[in-house]
Amino acid sequence: MKSVLVVYSGGLDSYTLLNKALKEFDRIEAITFDYGQKHKKEIQYATQVCLELKIEHEVVNLDLENILSGSALVGGKKIPEGNYDKEQMKQTVVPNRNMIMISIAASLAIKNNLNTLWYAAHAGDHEIYPDCRPEFIESLAAVLQICDYHKINFQAPFMNYSKTDIVAEGLRMNLDFSKTWTCYVGDESPCLRCGSCLERKSAFELNNVQDPLR
């Protein structure tokens, strides 16, 4: 039986990946992390989707706000506005976040006897986020083959996809993107000004469709 644990934030990329997993695996589980992020609304979206899809879902409270608070996503810094710019968007890097999350996710996969671990890093993240780059993914994949008696196949299927490509993939699957949350600001509605919102807007425009959250 093919089995997978999907690291699922509640965002557009991991929502598409979760639905891709439903087509490719016999057994699917999901894990979501509350690490003190301002945009906790994404956790609500992840929980609701997993309920609808009847996917076993673990929400992990990391309670690491004091350690991770150097990032604008967690601490008191303002979320930067405007299109993705490397120096500006470095403020949204959460120190070693994906390493921490993937390590915990691997432990859950081992405990639940799942063979594969997926997460939704994509090509648009490479420039800004070190823990989304191919060398990180490849190195961690090697580690997860030797860190336990139960080997985990760690993969990032969207590693070479742009955000536009991911939206296109979701549209081919007829996904409802209103069930995703992208904005980094913790308001009730998307701010439409942060880099994450603007990247999402561009991805839908390049696919000639209206973002359902607009």
Regions found by a protein language model. Give the residues of each.
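Local cysteine-cluster metal-coordination motifs and their immediate loop/turn environment
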Residues: 103, 179-202
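Short cysteine/histidine-rich metal-coordination sites, predominantly Zn2+-binding motifs
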Residues: 186-187, 208-214
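Short Fe-S-cluster ligation motifs
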Residues: 198, 204-211
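ATP-dependent adenylation/nucleotidyltransferase module used to activate substrates
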Residues: 1-174
